[in-house]
Amino acid sequence: MIDLSPLARRLAGTPLATWANGLQAQLDAKMEKGHGDLERWQSALDALPKIQPSEIDLINGLRLDTDCDDATRAQMRTALMGLSPWRKGPFDLFGVHVDTEWRSDWKWSRVAPHLNLEGKRILDVGCGNGYYMWRMLGAGAHSVIGVDPNWLFFCQFQAVQRYLSEPSVWHLPFPFEDLPANLEGFDTVFSMGVFYHRRSPIEHLLALKDCLVKGGELVLETLVVEGDQHQVLVPEDRYAQMRNVWFLPSVPALELWLRRAGFSDVRCVDVSVTSIEEQRGTEWMKYQSLSDFLDPNDHSKTIEGLPAPMRAVIVAKK
């Protein structure tokens, strides 16, 4: 059983206290339903060596280390490989380099300079395996809660958390929709790589705003296209082989949507074309990746002939 009482204690006396007190029952019910692969992933977690880090670096990356022998490292590698595919990272865990599909550290280096997370209560929507949550903690956050219904990502988070018995970072295997309306308890809310999967983009923005305290900050990272405030791409079918992509606005259109949803001080702090160096297949993620989804003769287009992935980071205030 995963004990959420430290989370409830951490959030006592905050606007999130009532919600936090009900999370244990919600998690227990979710765990009881489970997932077909959960037993296999749990076996991988159980196979992790029982060691403690003497060195922890969450500022320059995510690195844990201590004196350990080759046999321990081999055991660590085998157990972590049992939780493949690893998409967000990289992680350096006791001499084992988990070379994930995404160089998420590159994205973080583009986002982090524009934020002050010191002492903040943070919600990470669609948090994946929690890579960014640990980086948020490294940036001084008071507490970080991530929600993502993917059970493999939940188990990958557990693999790291067992070496960082940190009462400030929590992964809840829930969809964002399971959060109560009008929480209004987080200082900063992140939605990175989620927006384009939403059928109702304005509804998503309003739901994110509902999670923030007055004056709180939204960090929104999503796929965009070139153009003015009237330019929005809605793919006919797939986009870069993804079925569930709905709206790719231009940056001016996205800024307009945010203002319309009631946000202020809306700023675009970064726009980057995703390269095949930033997202690629590795031995830790052996499936197709970005290079397979682009036109082989013209990397400025997807395989469907649409503009290649370009991502913007927008920061806005409630």
Curated annotation (Swiss-Prot):
What Gene Ontology molecular function terms does this protein carry?
A: methyltransferase activity; transferase activity, transferring alkyl or aryl (other than methyl) groups
How does the annotation summarize its subunit structure?
A: Homotetramer.
Which gene carries the instructions for this protein?
Answer: cmoB
Query: Of which family is this protein a member?
Result: Belongs to the class I-like SAM-binding methyltransferase superfamily. CmoB family.
Q: What does this protein do?
A: Catalyzes carboxymethyl transfer from carboxy-S-adenosyl-L-methionine (Cx-SAM) to 5-hydroxyuridine (ho5U) to form 5-carboxymethoxyuridine (cmo5U) at position 34 in tRNAs.
Source organism per UniProt: Pseudomonas fluorescens (strain ATCC BAA-477 / NRRL B-23932 / Pf-5)
Q: Which GO terms describe its biological process?
A: tRNA wobble uridine modification
Concerning CDD domains, the annotation shows: AdoMet_MTases
Catalytic activity entry: carboxy-S-adenosyl-L-methionine + 5-hydroxyuridine(34) in tRNA = 5-carboxymethoxyuridine(34) in tRNA + S-adenosyl-L-homocysteine + H(+)
Name it: tRNA U34 carboxymethyltransferase
